[in-house]
C-alpha cells in the first residue's frame, strides 16, 4: 500500500494513456495500452486508497475487457485527481461511466471490432444530454440514496 502511494503519478499516467489512446489492433500501440491497463488494475488492487464497485447495471456493456480497463482508468484518475479516497462515490460512478461512453463513441469502430459492448442506451442518453441524471438515478437505485460505497469490488456475473 505504501508503494502505491509512491507510484500515484505512474498510475495516473497509465490511466490517462488508456483514456486518451485507442486500443488499436497493431502490436506496438496495443502492447503499451495493455501494459498500462495491467498497471492500473494492479495499482487499484494493491492500493488501500481506491475502492471501485462494478454496478450491476454495467453487465450489459462491461463484457468487454477494454471497456472495463477504461472504467478502471477513469476511476483511478478520478480518485487521484479529485482525492476521492476509500469510497466508490456517485461522482466517481458518473465520471467513470461517462468516460466509458465518450471513449466508446470516439473509438466505436475499433471497440465494435474488439468486443461490441452494448452501449446504445448510454450513448443515446449522452447525446441527449441526459446521461449524468440517468447515472445519478442509477447509482441511487443500486446503492441506496446515493451513499458512497465502502465495500470492495462487485464483479459482474
Ranges and model annotations:
Residues 28-142, 146:
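Mature extracellular/secreted ectodomains of secretory-pathway proteins
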Residues 1-6, 134-157:
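Non-catalytic accessory regions used for complex assembly or targeting
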Residues 1-37:
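Immediate post-signal-peptide N-terminus of mature secreted/exported proteins
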Amino acid at each position: 500500500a505504501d508503494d502505491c502511494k509512491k507510484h500515484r503519478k505512474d498510475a495516473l499516467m497509465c490511466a490517462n494513456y488508456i483514456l486518451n489512446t485507442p486500443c488499436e489492433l497493431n502490436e506496438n500501440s496495443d502492447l503499451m495500452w495493455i501494459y498500462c491497463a495491467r498497471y492500473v488494475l494492479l495499482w487499484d488492487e494493491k492500493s488501500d486508497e481506491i475502492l471501485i464497485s462494478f454496478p450491476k447495471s454495467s453487465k450489459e456493456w462491461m463484457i468487454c475487457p477494454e471497456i472495463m480497463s477504461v472504467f478502471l482508468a477513469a476511476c483511478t484518475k478520478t480518485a487521484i485527481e479529485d482525492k476521492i479516497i476509500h469510497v466508490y462515490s456517485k461522482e466517481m460512478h458518473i465520471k467513470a461511466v461517462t468516460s466509458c461512453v465518450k471513449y466508446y463513441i470516439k473509438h466505436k469502430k475499433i471497440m465494435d471490432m474488439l468486443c461490441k459492448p452494448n452501449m446504445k442506451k448510454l450513448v443515446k442518453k449522452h447525446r441527449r444530454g441526459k446521461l449524468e441524471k440517468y447515472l445519478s438515478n442509477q447509482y441511487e437505485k443500486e446503492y441506496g440514496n446515493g451513499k458512497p460505497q465502502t465495500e470492495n469490488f462487485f464483479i459482474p456475473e
